[in-house]
A protein has these predicted regions:
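Mature, Sec-exported extracytoplasmic domains of Gram-positive
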Residues: 1-134
Length: 134
């Protein structure tokens, strides 16, 4: 099952990065500096932005849906990393393409945007692609 594969991959990848990642869901959010992710995105309190562009987002076990971005998994090291070193990764799909997004945002802004960018980490991108297409 793909979620078990991703969990195993994130445990191994986290070790190589010296970080400890935990899985979160639409029912159980991570606390990122007081923001509950992905809850604040899914309930509309905060608008998700990818590369500065606001997008709609939804939780999707299958990776398909109507929104701009389908969130299939959330991983974070926020419980174990110190202040300003916390990461939240969203694993999902944009226009049916697998995409791993990351945020380290630690403060609010007037637009209530939660800013994500596609991860620059090729090992992480390739790992997710292999699980999706494997």
């Amino acid at each position: 099952d793909k979620s078990a594969q991703l969990e195993a991959f994130m445990a191994t990848w986290g070790q190589t990065m010296g970080q400890q990642y935990k899985s979160y869901t639409n029912q159980m959010s991570v606390d990122l500096y007081g923001l509950k992710v992905p809850q604040v995105i899914l309930n509309g309190e905060w608008k998700m932005a990818i590369g500065g562009v606001p997008v709609s987002a939804e939780w999707s076990e299958s990776g398909t849906g109507q929104a701009d971005y389908q969130i299939t998994a959330v991983y974070s090291d926020a419980e174990t990393e110190p202040y300003l070193k916390k990461h939240v990764y969203l694993f999902g799909f944009q226009q049916n393409q697998p995409k791993v997004l990351v945020t380290q945002q630690n403060q609010g802004n007037p637009d209530n945007y939660l800013y994500f960018n596609e991860t620059a980490n090729n090992e992480l991108k390739n790992g997710f692609n292999q699980i999706v297409y494997g």
